[in-house]
Amino acid sequence: SLMKGPNGLGKPADLKRFTLLHIGSFPDDWQVWLTAAGVKGVDASRGVSFDFALAAYQAAMDGLGVALGRNPLVEPDLKAGRLVVPFEFKRSSDFAYYLVYPPEAIRRRKIKAFRDWIVSLSEVAQQAA
């Protein structure tokens, strides 16, 4: 575990000793997080980049480095103890998904059921954040 021992990950400044795992579609995430957390002396550009978030999370589970996670994607692994949240600081994301459909489609029962379901998932994720 990266958290244990005298060289473990105890505070955000310790990240300078660890590989940062980046998600290619969010190249600035580490810089934004470090700045928001007030962390100095950590080069946000270093580390390994992955095309898919789940690959970065798997690398973190394998002990290859530290990744920034999005709650809906990492929650099962946090609950199972495969991942841990090393710091109390959390940063909300401006990232969003949009459900789009033609106006008349909402009259279709399946479309309305899907919309209601996806909105309920979003509300649960917002409460967990």
Segments predicted by a language model, with ranges:
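Hydrophobic hinge/microswitch elements
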Residues: 42-85, 92
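Secondary-structure junction motif
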Residues: 19-37
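Residues at the C-termini of beta-strands that transition into short coil/loop
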Residues: 24, 51, 87-90, 103
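Short helix-loop capping/hinge motifs at secondary-structure junctions, enriched
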Residues: 2-10, 41, 104-109
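Alpha-helical segments flanking ligand/cofactor-binding loops in enzyme cores
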Residues: 13, 57-58, 112
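C-terminal effector-binding regulatory domain of bacterial HTH transcription factors
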Residues: 71-80, 90-129
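Alpha-helix/helix-capping structural signal
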Residues: 1, 25-28, 54, 72-73
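Flexible hinge/capping segments at coil-to-helix
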Residues: 1-20, 36
